[in-house]
């Protein structure tokens, strides 16, 4: 199973993600703010980061840019999550280097499909 870092400030979404990831056997942990997220990504080198775009202290877009600027993190997958699921937002996230984009609220089956796509055999 995969090692996943969840960066999400909304408790109800974080709880749903915890339920899904635990049930599917993934190792995961949560950060509620962007502060320290990049350091955690560098230190733990997760397989995937589930990253909220609208964090209270830093934009998820900035974190994606920082991850993609570090060659040592090229294999870390990033799935952006946002309540603003417009085509413009999706294009922006993907252009900055995100591997996927999912609009909140999402169905668990939709998230599972994205996890399978991004993680391949580790899902």
What would you call each of these model-derived segments?
Residues 11-29, 118:
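Two-component/phosphorelay signaling modules centered on CheY-like receiver
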Residues 33, 59-65:
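Acidic catalytic/metal-coordinating carboxylates
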Residues 8:
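Conserved acidic carboxylate
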Residues 30-48:
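Acidic, metal-coordinating helix/loop segments flanking the phosphotransfer/catalytic sites
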Residues 56, 74, 86:
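The feature encodes the CheY-like receiver
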Residues 18, 62, 85-100, 113:
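Alpha4 helix (beta4-alpha4-beta5 surface) of REC/receiver domains from two-component response regulators
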Residues 106-116:
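C-terminal output helix
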